[in-house]
Regions:
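Hydrophobic, aromatic-enriched interface-forming segments
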Residues: 166-232
Length: 351
């Protein structure tokens, strides 16, 4: 993006921000240099790769929609890559240009010819990258709005993006919340790339898919049984974190109900699941923003009350994971026994 165009965009964003403030629209996150004005698609660089979050429906919807948008804008089949948080943090950013979605904007992404379309909270300003950001919308919805500017919308996508948005933002008061949770659970159960292959990249095929009947049965039968069992099987990890042992049902909904009903003394509840590639994922939930801080300690990320982290590959089993988490999340007390200077050495008791 040349300097003249960049200056114009920032100027437009400044005007737009002023209008939003004047009419009491949703304010931008503090410090974020983001822009959502006019025909934003005309400002997007041609990407060498599109990178999205692998763990949920929002990442799937956002990634596939951006791939369609790139096809429309540049007549190119751009490679889609999906990452978990741990993999993403370790990934080198070698591409000259990229679109990143459903992954938090961070300093290393502030590169010329890079675009980030995301909704996670951030305090960073974009000086080189194009940042399209709104914490009040899912990543999928932000990407869909870009697609609509190029005539890529449809009633089927309207419906699917709405359901994905409701599930990702956990909009409990929306009348479609239960159904939206079933859609979101498809990715949790069948995994990102399996579902992508089944749909052949056509998101519309997900609407009213027969697998939703499986999700509905699991919700009606498994969730109540799982909730009752898990309530009695919460294991301490640290003073602030409890491990919810789950044997059946939708882990996220079970943990959410435990938090809502204050069935546990722990402000953060954690679940673990082992992927087919033997990697163990920790999912964290809270009510007052504590989950994200714990996830970041584990080199993960996400939202304030809904976060996740991939544990090191050396952690092979759930018991190993519990031991690892206890070591990382409990403050070490060695400094209390370590002499701080010569006076401490001479004053230390001798036996």
């Amino acid at each position: 993006m040349n300097s003249r165009l960049r200056t114009t965009l920032v100027g437009l964003w400044t005007v737009d921000r002023g209008l939003r403030s004047l009419f009491s629209f949703r304010s931008w996150p503090v410090g974020s240099d983001s822009i959502i004005v006019g025909q934003m698609t005309s400002c997007l660089p041609r990407p060498d790769v599109i990178i999205t979050h692998e763990s949920d429906l929002d990442g799937l919807v956002a990634g596939v929609l951006l791939r369609r948008l790139a096809q429309k804008l540049f007549n190119a089949e751009v490679r889609l890559e999906a990452c978990h948080y741990h993999t993403w943090r370790q990934r080198e950013l070698r591409e000259p240009s990229a679109w990143v979605t459903d992954l938090t904007f961070e300093q290393r992404l502030d590169k010329p010819n890079w675009a980030v379309i995301d909704h996670h909270a951030t305090e960073l300003k974009a000086h080189n990258a194009l940042l399209i950001h709104d914490i009040g919308k899912s990543a999928g919805l932000l990407c869909y709005e870009l697609c609509q500017q190029q005539g890529l919308g449809s009633p089927a996508l309207d419906r699917l993006v709405h359901l994905s948005n409701v599930a990702d933002l956990f909009l409990e008061d929306d009348p479609d919340f239960v159904l939206a949770s079933d859609y979101a659970n498809l990715v949790k159960i069948y995994q990102f790339w399996n579902l992508h292959a089944l749909l052949e990249g056509r998101l519309e095929r997900l609407l009213d898919h027969p697998l939703l009947e499986v999700m509905a049965v699991k919700r009606r039968i498994e969730d109540p049984l799982g909730l009752a069992w898990s309530r009695e099987n919460i294991v301490p990890i640290s003073p602030a974190v409890g491990f919810v042992n789950t044997v059946i049902g939708n882990n996220n909904l079970i943990v959410h109900q435990l938090l809502e009903r204050q069935a546990s003394a722990y402000p953060v509840l954690l679940t673990l699941f082992r992927r087919t590639n033997a990697v163990i994922i920790a999912s964290l939930r809270s009510r007052n923003g504590e989950a994200l801080k714990v996830a970041e300690t584990l080199q993960g990320g996400g939202h304030a009350n809904a976060s996740a982290a991939t544990l090191p590959r050396s952690v092979k089993t759930i018991p190993d994971a519990l031991n690892y988490l206890r070591q990382v999340l409990n403050p070490r007390k060695q400094e209390l026994a370590t002499p701080q200077g010569l006076s401490d050495i001479f004053d230390a008791p001798r036996g």
